[in-house]
């Protein structure tokens, strides 16, 4: 079987599996997909080191140590949560920059709750943003986070639709939880 045929078969199987039981993520206000420039597929190469570790990265690029024990590198789940933090963080910075709102500091903590049964998948994620910037108003920060988490972050959009994702923030030292919770 050629690589192209294998990819076609995997794509077909994924579409069938999705239609067979996966719920479609409800569209958020303004989240209709619009055509974008076609990009090459993302490609990562992972090399096993003989233990419960892999070194993974773009071909010819820097690598990241994935460690099933968590002793010498991040676990695969840690990397997934890190990807969500990085993705939403980059989107937040871009959104605030477009509004000419300078950010002095952005820290993100991600807490992933896992199921008690194998495969111990993530069932809920809480994102905690700490943002500092003299000119940032609460509504600007809230809007940027909401857009990042619910519209623009491709990592978020790639997660299972039944994962509950919530967020809170501290803006210039003042805590805030959307909805007053």
Regions flagged by a language model, labelled:
Residues 87-88:
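Alpha-helical metal-binding/catalytic segments enriched in His/Glu/Asp
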Residues 1-82, 92-181:
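Extended beta-strand/beta-hairpin segments
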């Amino acid at each position: 079987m050629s690589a192209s045929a294998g990819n076609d078969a995997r794509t077909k199987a994924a579409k069938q599996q999705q239609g067979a039981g996966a719920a479609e993520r409800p569209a958020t206000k303004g989240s209709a997909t619009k055509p974008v420039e076609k990009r090459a597929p993302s490609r990562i190469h992972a090399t096993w080191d003989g233990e419960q570790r892999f070194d993974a990265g773009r071909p010819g690029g820097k690598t990241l140590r994935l460690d099933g024990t968590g002793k010498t590198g991040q676990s695969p789940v840690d990397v997934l949560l890190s990807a969500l933090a990085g993705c939403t963080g980059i989107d937040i910075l871009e959104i605030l920059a477009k509004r000419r709102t300078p950010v002095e500091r952005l820290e993100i903590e991600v807490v992933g709750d896992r199921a008690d049964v194998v495969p111990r998948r993530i069932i809920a994620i809480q994102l905690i943003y700490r943002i500092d910037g003299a000119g940032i108003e609460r509504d600007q920060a809230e809007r940027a986070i909401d857009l990042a988490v619910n519209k623009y972050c491709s990592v978020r959009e790639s997660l299972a639709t039944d994962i509950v994702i919530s967020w809170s923030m501290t803006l210039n030292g003042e805590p805030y939880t959307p909805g007053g919770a």
